[in-house]
Amino acid sequence: NNKFLDITLKNDNNNKKKYLEIYSDLPRPLLSEYNFFKGLIGGTLTFSSVIELTETNSKLTIENFKIKNAPGLVKLLSLADFGGLADLAEGEGLSFEKLEMIMNNNKGFLKLEELYAVGPSISVLMEGYKESNGLISLRGTLVPAKNLNKFISKIPVIGKIVIPKDVGEGLFGVSFKIKGMPGEVKTTINPIKTL
């Protein structure tokens, strides 16, 4: 099958830190405990983490993957009235070119400092936290049709005024909030947001 998994752990005894690095072209089993990654297909994963006594700072990157039959994402797309994308997510899956996630874990409090995922049909920006008791609180923006926004950004004057330079940001989006305890998570949508 020619799948690879490379794990490196280095100790820095002077600074009381450990450095963990993981590379794999089979990311799904490594992320199976996280609901957010249910339905992940394919992709290559790079994960790096600096582990201190009570705190861990990590960065996760996944490239060239699909999300298929992920209930949370399908629900979010349906609530946002992106019906066609919800159907695609349930059918052949939504493609993404890149996902990057930066997080900090301090004594069981997980802070998602930034998550962005960029794909040809939709991009996602998100931040939030998960408490040690299981409570999650996330907020973010869904931006459909990256290609349309790319097209507009190429119009010299309009593009500079309207389109921010950040990856994943576009002209029109939908803001969302996800909050609650496991099994009682509520999702709310703000239907139209101009970024």
Where do the PLM segments sit?
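Gram-negative outer-membrane assembly/targeting C-terminal domains
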Residues: 183-195
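Small-residue helix/turn framework positions
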Residues: 1-179
